[in-house]
Amino acid sequence: MASSTTASLGFHYETKYVVLSYLGLLSQEKQQGPSPPGVQLDVAPQSLNPEVLLKLKSEIEEELKTLDKEVSEAFTSTGFDCHTSPVFSPANPESSIEDCLAHLGERVSQDLKEPLQKALQTILSQPVTYEAYRECTVETAVHASGWNKLLVPLVLLQHLLLELTRRGQEPLRMLLQFGVMYLEEHAAEFIIQQGGWGSVFSLEPEEEEYPGIIAEDSNDIYILPSDNSGQVSPPESPTVTTSWQSESLPVSLSASQSWHTESLPVSLGPESWQQIAMDPEEVKSLDSSGAGEKSENNSSNSDIVHVEKEEVPEEAFPGAAAPLLTQVPTVEAPEMMRAEKTSPTPSVFVELGEEELEAVTARPEAVERAEGAAQLSEERAGSRKKSHTGEAAAVRGAKSGLPAEGKAVLLFGGAAAVAILAVAVGVALALRRK
């Protein structure tokens, strides 16, 4: 960045103010304890004795006052006013140029730690001269670019001031002259092209220059372009992840309704829930058919089914033929009586308890209500004559093939079965309401 441009007096004053202000940051460091003897190779400045720091701060303040007086005296000839300079009088009183440069200096100290240590050791190993300082600064600055390149001489000056002051010397004025000369010779052209020292205030913060750091910290936020937005699928519903709840449910119940069956007692599972909502006639058919599959050797179930079919009046099916009479098994009355005594009708409601079943079979009025329910079922069956033509033929055959005494026994057994089923449905509805 060597420049042959003759720096103006205004630039000279601003450069001198920048160097003094940056060196003054050292006097603002908090005490961190005694420093070990010898040259400190750590980039971070080590604190000095509080008395030494106070003395250094006083020297820098005196130099700033001298600079202000010099600028005021040269105003008539130069026209440079401290009040119009962004370096001396920032637009924002809360900010200062040394604070802006301090952020850049910290980064340079970390990025160029080894080159700065080597340059500091080289300068202190011989008499401190401007030539030695310039050569070491140029060698170190090749590792940086932009404004970071300008921070190299300032950071190196700060460390030299620290080490020489610790050795009992007073190098402030000498180092101030080194810094101003180097910046005017090697950095004036770059600074003027950037708009002067005032452009330091408009530099982007460190976080914006390293967007990768922000991206790593905010990996839970995704900003997708418009062309790829259609490829993103919405998150799965919680009911999908809990498919184990719906595997045991019938098809008519969705996974979101699993709470209905979870709150029911043990005797009312998904199957009984579905049967409660069905027609009583269909419930009887499902009850008898399901029981037949579970116990093939139990003949009482098929007997009850035949009783229900037998009670369908002949007038409901006048045009039905009777070729299926031989397929209807004939059950004797004694056999039916033994079946009723030894083998109760199987049903999905066996969990209701034996006491309730005994109470139902022991009361005659329950039988009468059951006969009324049987007559009601016969009327409903009559309205479905179109879908039960084949069944009517079998019923007619069974009716003509059975004796009168067997019919009475079968009628009583069917009524008892209907009564049991009605009580079971009522108990199930009561449990459901609870």
From Swiss-Prot:
* BH3, short sequence motif: residues: 97-113
UniProt cross-references to Pfam families, sorted A to Z? Bcl-2
GO cellular component, alphabetical, reads: membrane; mitochondrial membrane; mitochondrion
Where is it located?
Answer: Mitochondrion membrane
Membrane topology is: Single-pass membrane protein
Q: Where is this motif: BH1?
A: 144-154
Where is the region Disordered?
A: 224-245, 282-303, 363-398
* The entry's keywords: Apoptosis, Membrane, Mitochondrion, Phosphoprotein, Repeat, Transmembrane, Transmembrane helix
Q: Which residues carry this modification: Phosphoserine?
A: S35, S256, S258, S300, S343, S347, S377, S387
Bilayer-crossing residues are 409-429
Residue ranges of A repeats: 243-253, 258-268
UniProt short sequence motif BH4, positions renumbered to this chain: 14-30
From what superkingdom does this record's organism come?
Eukaryota
Return the Basic and acidic residues bias intervals: 365-382
Give the GO biological process terms. apoptotic process; canonical glycolysis; fat cell differentiation; mitochondrion organization; mitophagy; oxidative phosphorylation; regulation of apoptotic process
Residues spanning the signal sequence: none
Q: Which stretches are tagged as biased composition: Polar residues?
A: 226-245
Motif BH2 in this chain:
190-203
**Keyword Transmembrane helix assigned:** yes
- What PANTHER family does its record include? BCL-2-LIKE PROTEIN 13 (PTHR15758:SF2)
Q: What does this protein do?
A: May promote the activation of caspase-3 and apoptosis.
Family under the similarity heading: Belongs to the Bcl-2 family.
Subunit structure as annotated in this protein's UniProt entry: Monomer.
Protein name stated in the entry: Bcl-2-like protein 13
Q: Which organism is it from?
A: Mus musculus
